[in-house]
């Protein structure tokens, strides 16, 4: 059975979204494990940037501050796929030694190249709320 252009467009978008969710999971696990080399592989081969709280990093090694009891979790992913480009906005939750530390928002750009999805830019803006009010239990 032949698919229409619209059916193929929707299917490709869904496949891209699923792959980007997997990219996020891998990125978070590598960050939490303190695996700098692995974490960097979630970004495009060259030209990727990372911005945290307004500070831009073009050398991703200098941006890395994971591991050492830190756990990064992302939720509420809003992903838009357009061919080989995609954008994402999601919520970041940061835990240290299993205690909630901070929440924020990632705004990401992705590219499909070399058979997979990668971050081209990742911008993290932390929320400006006191720690004890950020995640009521």
Residue positions per predicted region:
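C-terminal-biased regions
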Residues: 2-6, 71-80, 125-128, 135
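A solvent-exposed, acidic/Ser-Thr-rich amphipathic alpha-helical stretch
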Residues: 30-94
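Conserved aromatic-histidine-acidic binding/catalytic patches
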Residues: 12-15, 67, 98
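Short, surface-exposed beta-strand-loop junctions and turns on beta-sheet-rich folds
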Residues: 94-96, 125-126
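Short, low-complexity N-terminal intrinsically disordered segments enriched in polar/charged residues
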Residues: 1-33, 37-42
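Short solvent-exposed loop/turn micro-motifs enriched in small/polar/acidic residues
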Residues: 22, 70-72, 101-103
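Surface-exposed coil/turn segments at beta-strand junctions on protein surfaces, enriched
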Residues: 81, 99-101, 112
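Short beta-strand edge/turn micro-motifs at domain boundaries
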Residues: 87, 103-137
């Amino acid at each position: 059975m032949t698919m229409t252009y619209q059916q193929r467009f929707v299917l490709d978008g869904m496949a891209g979204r699923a792959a980007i969710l997997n990219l996020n999971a891998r990125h978070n696990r590598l960050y939490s494990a303190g695996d700098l080399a692995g974490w960097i592989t979630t970004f495009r081969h060259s030209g990727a940037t990372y911005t945290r709280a307004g500070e831009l990093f073009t050398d991703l090694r200098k941006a890395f501050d994971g591991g050492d009891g830190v756990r990064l979790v992302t939720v509420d992913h809003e992903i838009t796929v357009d061919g080989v480009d995609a954008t994402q906005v999601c919520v970041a939750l940061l835990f240290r030694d299993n205690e909630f530390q901070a929440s924020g928002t990632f705004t990401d750009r992705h590219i499909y190249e070399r058979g997979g999805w990668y971050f081209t830019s990742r911008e993290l803006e932390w929320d400006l709320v006191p720690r004890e009010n950020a995640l009521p239990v």
